[in-house]
């Protein structure tokens, strides 16, 4: 039989470790506990945002379930950054950085404490990939437990979510919302605990990780405050014991085929562009090369079927009500769009997990059949051209068309764009260029939700495109292209764009072009000087020194 405490016994059963054992007795462990496997339960819980405010309570449920399986569960915490709070401020530069800090800190604690397994209770956007990256590096039995989605808010009969609050600002600029309604939307958009409710980054990553096999069935769609979520947490102990006994580790689960399942889920649900960065980084943690071309191949073959916000009508709670992510996976498997033989954290394969799962409800309109897709091919399009010779990522829902040509309106940060929208600088037909916001130039590759929301709220969404070497929130919609590489800080072509230049974006042939002669670009490049890093010490400075490009997942351990 497999020894399930093969790591912790180094501390608990070695007579040359008396001080370590004294400390463990000091926290309340018994003689019998010294022979049990130890499970590190990491929570990204903190009081500062709705996505994470309930996670420490869920971690206690997880600990109870672990103890019920004759295992020792020990809770520890790591950081979280709220994208919703930091968006549009300098704080957003710490968001992507937090993903790698989360991964590093979980790896550090589990390795130093000699835990035999890991259960991660996570909420906001970067929590999920950060925890799974750590699991991949550690390669010990592990399960991710998603904190679940928030319920929708309500104001004057209208359903609200976090993007309603962001877009209210653009409506205010455009004088299409009253002061009372502006305040009403803000006060009611987030009615309690849970991650942002649309198919934004948190729900995208939770769904992708469930399809990957690293979370239990329904984890991604069980609402935050539901009895189902509590039961999932209680059941995690039984599941982690199975993984310990069978010695099933992340590298057994996170295979190339499993990542193909995850990419399929991202596309079919119309998920966030951030999934490109995060899945590449997660694959890197288990020594699998995932590329931009893998995402394009998926988009070429998989349609968008879920009518979910930000581009569609519904929220994750609506998808859960008609069957949830497992029912979606069952539909995809029945139509030969998923690999059913991939192993998962249940100890069973995808196909085995789905065998007795109820199908999507008859007559529901949240997830459409293959014969009537929202978009016949994927919304994530990888674009190349003289503006992005190493690639970029466009999010094209189908509402924007597939071609845009316009005059560049250049900004060297995201803040001045807001003033540009407010003051009428940004006009119909413009291509807004936001640069020096890449992994190094930011530093931290901030999201552009505030500028895109201002553009949408001002009624310019169908007539203005936006391109950047930064990122987009999962809540962004419109004609947008991000992750442009090389970034401006590294002297990429985006650094050479001038106001009035013509930019062409063609998602049919996957190109993004600056219509400027090679001679002129060579002249501009010779005159360009690399700016000083915006950070001169601390975590952002360290990040800028070691981060890879967006096309490589912005990893910091390569």
Swiss-Prot record:
Cofactor note: Binds 1 [2Fe-2S] cluster per subunit. This cluster acts as a Lewis acid cofactor.
GO MF term (any one): 2 iron, 2 sulfur cluster binding
Residue positions binding Mg(2+): 83, 125-126, 447
Residues annotated as the enzyme's active site: 473
EC id: 4.2.1.9
Positions bearing N6-carboxylysine: 126
Keywords in alphabetical order: 2Fe-2S, Amino-acid biosynthesis, Branched-chain amino acid biosynthesis, Iron, Iron-sulfur, Lyase, Magnesium, Metal-binding
EC main group: lyase
Residues engaged in binding [2Fe-2S] cluster: 51, 124, 196
A biological-process GO annotation: L-valine biosynthetic process
Cofactor (UniProt): [2Fe-2S] cluster; Mg(2+)
Pathway(s) of this molecule: Amino-acid biosynthesis; L-isoleucine biosynthesis; L-isoleucine from 2-oxobutanoate: step 3/4; Amino-acid biosynthesis; L-valine biosynthesis; L-valine from pyruvate: step 3/4
Catalytic activity: (2R)-2,3-dihydroxy-3-methylbutanoate = 3-methyl-2-oxobutanoate + H2O; (2R,3R)-2,3-dihydroxy-3-methylpentanoate = (S)-3-methyl-2-oxopentanoate + H2O
InterPro entries given in the database record: DHAD_IlvD/Edd, Dihydro-acid_dehy_C, DihydroxyA_deHydtase, DiOHA_6PGluconate_deHydtase_CS, ILV_EDD_C, ILV_EDD_N, IlvD/EDD_N
Known role: Functions in the biosynthesis of branched-chain amino acids. Catalyzes the dehydration of (2R,3R)-2,3-dihydroxy-3-methylpentanoate (2,3-dihydroxy-3-methylvalerate) into 2-oxo-3-methylpentanoate (2-oxo-3-methylvalerate) and of (2R)-2,3-dihydroxy-3-methylbutanoate (2,3-dihydroxyisovalerate) into 2-oxo-3-methylbutanoate (2-oxoisovalerate), the penultimate precursor to L-isoleucine and L-valine, respectively.
Subunit composition and interactions: Homodimer.
Family: Belongs to the IlvD/Edd family.
Protein name: Dihydroxy-acid dehydratase
Organism per entry: Flavobacterium psychrophilum (strain ATCC 49511 / DSM 21280 / CIP 103535 / JIP02/86)
